[in-house]
């Protein structure tokens, strides 16, 4: 069993009620989805069930990336990046039709939000942000 790493501010989203609420807020079918910090992939699985056009996962924890790659290898519309979202080159992967979803690590949630807001200022870079902030 994988336990959250406090050093990364991890808190895995496992509540089905919350997962379903996030999915209801998001038009996933045939859209480009970017998930920040997929963790163990609970939200990712729900996203996949709703048939996105493309799905990009950005996860810093190498152990979790290995598990995600193994668990999701049958999906060909999926890219997984083992990177820190604060250093990730959003411009190369996100387009104006993307929907960004994230259950943000509590220790860097403000920095991620600022990065996404600054990224949007110059041109429309994504369609919508659906973010959850942990306490």
Stretches with model-predicted labels:
Residues 1-135:
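Catalytic cores of RNA-modifying enzymes
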